[in-house]
């Protein structure tokens, strides 16, 4: 009888254990105890409970936080956090019950801000600079375990760089209303000698490490070479061709025709006019200017205009025009007194009482001609 009672108790215990094994614990997605959500983003948390008698109830609850939007049905509850703010961070608890038994699962919701806004100071390094600073703007959280900085060269941390510790300050922009307060964190390093050759750039890397999440942003810091090294090739290479090439052709090609061509026609052509040009001027350019045979063969004015025309077509037109205008002006000045003289002689010829000098000489000429015919020319009266 005792043996039968023992079997009965064992059967009942096995039945109870079987029912308990059929009841599964709560299933939460995502399963991590800490869930990170970006500031302004949205996230869903789903909680499920399977129960044999289909009488399970599941519900999300918040602890001193804004819970969010919750949709629940039999054995399932979904929590949605939209446009997450810093106030949405906190603890969420999923509570489920089945057959008189209660289960719960806790989730820590963490809201972070880590935009790609890194600035460096100075913007570019020169070998010998003592320090460099890197600042991450509008970030949270600022715990050193969550936010860290590193100074890299060639993908590895710069050896010998000494970190001086982060500086945390609130952003200068004042929050309005329910806006969240964000921070800027600055890390400074004391730089070692960069060595030779100098690397082209250093990199500031900021890393945000949260449970189930790791983000990194990187900002380049160019390294300029010493200012004295690039100057010699830059100054010597362009100056040598610039100074020698333009000066030699300018002085040799332009100066001789400028001094010889315009001066002689200005002095000789208007004064002698066409009378003395054939006797004097052809010899003077031949004797003084032995380099140009064209000047000795041509006339005084044309001989000096021809070489200028060959070298400078624009300069040839100006002396020729001056010579022509001077000649026309001289003819006009000579025509006016000639006309007045001719007019005066004409009036004297028409006047009977004042015959012209040519008419008064006629009797003497005729008398002299008569004496010559008789052979008495040259005999003085005695």
From Swiss-Prot:
Sequence repeats lie at residues 228-231, 232-239, 240-247, 248-255, 256-263, 264-271. It is a single-pass type I membrane protein. The Ser/Thr-rich mucin-like domain may provide possible sites for O-glycosylation. One of its GO terms (cellular component) is membrane. Highly expressed on high endothelial venules (HEV) and lamina propia venules found in the small intestine, and to a lesser extent in the colon and spleen. Very low levels of expression found in pancreas and brain. Not expressed in the thymus, prostate, ovaries, testis, heart, placenta, lung, liver, skeletal muscle, kidney or peripheral blood leukocytes. Residues 228-271 are annotated as: 5.5 X 8 AA tandem repeats of [PS]-P-D-T-T-S-[QP]-E. Residues 236-261, 277-288 have a biased composition (Low complexity). Glycans are attached at residue 83. One of its GO terms (molecular function) is integrin binding involved in cell-matrix adhesion. It is found in: Membrane. Pfam families: Adhes-Ig_like. Residues 223-314 are annotated as: Disordered. It comes from the Eukaryota. One of its GO terms (biological process) is receptor clustering. Disulfide bonds join 47-94, 51-98, 134-204. Its main location: membrane. The keyword Cytoplasm does not apply. InterPro entries: Adhes-Ig-like, Ig-like_dom, Ig-like_dom_sf, Ig-like_fold, Ig_sub, MADCAM1. Cell adhesion leukocyte receptor expressed by mucosal venules, helps to direct lymphocyte traffic into mucosal tissues including the Peyer patches and the intestinal lamina propria. It can bind both integrin alpha-4/beta-7 and L-selectin, regulating both the passage and retention of leukocytes. Isoform 2, lacking the mucin-like domain, may be specialized in supporting integrin alpha-4/beta-7-dependent adhesion strengthening, independent of L-selectin binding. This is Mucosal addressin cell adhesion molecule 1. It comes from Homo sapiens. The gene is MADCAM1.
């Amino acid at each position: 009888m005792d043996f039968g009672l023992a079997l009965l108790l064992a059967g009942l215990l096995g039945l109870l254990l079987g029912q308990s094994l059929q009841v599964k614990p709560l299933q939460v997605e995502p399963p991590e105890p800490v869930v990170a959500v970006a500031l302004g983003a949205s996230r869903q948390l789903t909680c499920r409970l399977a129960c044999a008698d289909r009488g399970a109830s599941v519900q999300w609850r918040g602890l001193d936080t804004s819970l969010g939007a919750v949709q629940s049905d039999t054995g399932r509850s979904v929590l949605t956090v939209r446009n997450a703010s810093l106030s949405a961070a906190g603890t969420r608890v999923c509570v489920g019950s089945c057959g008189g038994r209660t289960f719960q699962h806790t989730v820590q919701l963490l809201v972070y801000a880590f935009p790609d806004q890194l600035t460096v100071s100075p913007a570019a390094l020169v070998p010998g600079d003592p320090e460099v600073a890197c600042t991450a703007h509008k970030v949270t959280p600022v715990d050193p375990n969550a936010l860290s900085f590193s100074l890299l060269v060639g993908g590895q941390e710069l050896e010998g760089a000494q970190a001086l510790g982060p500086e945390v300050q609130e952003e200068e922009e004042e929050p309005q209303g329910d806006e969240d307060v964000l921070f800027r964190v600055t890390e400074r390093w004391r730089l070692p000698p960069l060595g030779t050759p100098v690397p082209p750039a250093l990199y500031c890397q900021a890393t945000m490490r949260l449970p189930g999440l790791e983000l990194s942003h990187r900002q380049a810091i160019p390294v300029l070479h010493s200012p004295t090294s690039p100057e010699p090739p830059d100054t010597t290479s362009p100056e040598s061709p610039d100074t020698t090439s333009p000066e030699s052709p300018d002085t040799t090609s332009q100066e001789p025709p400028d001094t010889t061509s315009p001066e002689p026609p200005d002095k000789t052509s208007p004064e002698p006019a066409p009378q003395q040009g054939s006797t004097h001027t052809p010899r003077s350019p031949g004797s003084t200017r032995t380099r140009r045979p064209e000047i000795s063969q041509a006339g005084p004015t044309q001989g000096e205009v021809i070489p200028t025309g060959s070298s400078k077509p624009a300069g040839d037109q100006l002396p020729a025009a001056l010579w022509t205008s001077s000649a026309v002006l001289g003819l006009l000045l000579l025509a006016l007194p000639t006309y007045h003289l001719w007019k005066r002689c004409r009036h004297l010829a028409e006047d009977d009482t004042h015959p012209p000098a040519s008419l008064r000489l006629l009797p003497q000429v005729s008398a002299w001609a008569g004496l010559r015919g008789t052979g008495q020319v040259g005999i003085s009266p005695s």
